[in-house]
Amino acid sequence: MTTCHRPTHERRFTNVRGHPPASRYAQEDARVFALAVRAISPLEDADIAQVLAITRPRELARGQFLLRAGERACEVGVVVSGLLREYFVMPDGTERTKAFGLSGYPTGSLADLLSGQPSKAFIVAEEPTRILVADYADSLALADRSLAWRRYGERLTQLILLVKAEREYELLGMDAAARYERFSARYPGLEARVAARHVASYLGITAVHLSRLRRRRRYAAAALRTRLKAS
C-alpha cells in the first residue's frame, strides 16, 4: 500500500486559539490563506483560526514535487506564493499539463484524494513556492464539527466542478486560437513564468502551433498600433 510522504521537520501554526502567528512570514501566509478561502465562502476569524491550527507551511524549490504519480494523495493546501503545475505523463514520456496553481489557489489532487488510489498526477513547483498544507483527514474531521467549513467544502467542490466543465468546453468546443486568448486573459503574465511547452500542453497544441499563435498576436497588435497612429 502506498503511503504519504511528508518532510519530518514541518511544524504546525502556533495560533491555535486565534493568536497571531509568531513571524511576519507566517502572518503573510495566514493573510493570503484567509483571502483565498474567503473568496470561496464567508468565514469568520474564528473559523480561520480553526483551520490554521491544523495547517503547516511548506517551501518547495523550483522542480520540487508536492505530489508524484504513484504516491497516495493525502494533503490539501493553498498556494501562498510561487507557482505549481499539475500534469500527467503519457506512456511515451510526454507531459500533459492539467492546471496551474498560482498564489491563492487551492492545491491537492481531489480525484486522487477521493479515490484513495495511488495518484495519477504530478504536482511540481515551477518556481520557488510556499504553501500551507493540511492532512486531508484533518480537514474532513474539521468539516464534521464545523458547519462553516462543511459549507466551504461544498462550495469548493462546486467551484472545482464548474472549472472542470469550463476546461472541457475549452478543449472540445473552442479552437486553439480562442483557447489561447482565454488562457492569456485568465492568467496574465503566466507565459513569462513557465516554459512554452507547458503552456502548449495545457492548451492541447504543439509548441510550434503556440509559436504561430504568438506571432499572429504580435502582428495583429502591430497592425492595430499602425492604424491608431494613422487615425
What is the predicted function of each stretch?
Residues 2-56:
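Cyclic nucleotide-binding regulatory module and flanking cytosolic helices
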Residues 33, 160-169:
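Short, Lys/Arg-enriched N-terminal segment that forms or immediately precedes the first helix
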Residues 39-46, 76, 130, 167-173, ...:
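Localized chelating/binding microdomains
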Residues 63, 74-87, 103-104:
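Glycine- and acidic-residue-biased ligand/ion/polar-headgroup-sensing regions
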Residues 66-71:
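Short phosphate-coordinating micro-motif centered on Lys-Gly-acidic
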Residues 87-93:
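Cytochrome P450 core scaffold surrounding the K-helix E-X-X-R motif
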Residues 97-154:
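Cyclic-nucleotide recognition modules
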Residues 174-231:
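Phosphate-/nucleic-acid-contacting segments
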